[in-house]
Amino acid sequence: MELKISIVTCSDTHDLAQDEAGAALEELIEAQGWTVASHVVVRDDVSEIGDAIVEAADECHANVVLTCGGTGLSMRDVTPEATRAVCEREVPGIAEAIRAYSMTKTRRAMLSRAICMQRGHTLVVNFPGSTKAARESWEAIADQLEHAAQMTAGGGHTN
């Protein structure tokens, strides 16, 4: 299955040209032979993040939306809240897997509030905003994204 993956970077301080974590994710997606359906940078704002997720899922028809940034403890970090506002179902195992893998790299991973949810047939996964942490999050789940996308599209389990 060829995946279409959208990237939504959440940052008050970066634009698309400065988005190193998003650019790294683009490279990783393309290295898998998958398509980057869209890549936008939005402010750390619940409405803007939610709108970008909806557009990626509903207009770009992404199988997966990766948000990047806004998952920490700062009051401006609102990506999990924005994700919950526009999605229907939690997929806790993916966020748990990212945290477990990241904890082998840094104990600070326990401070992440990142979540994973499903919006219709689209999986929405929150990644941290640093390039290193975004790469590690990708490493933690990339091998399961195709199966997850098949499942959210209504497919059955494969062995």
Residue ranges: model-predicted function:
Residues M1-N159:
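Non-catalytic beta/alpha edge segments that cap or flank active sites
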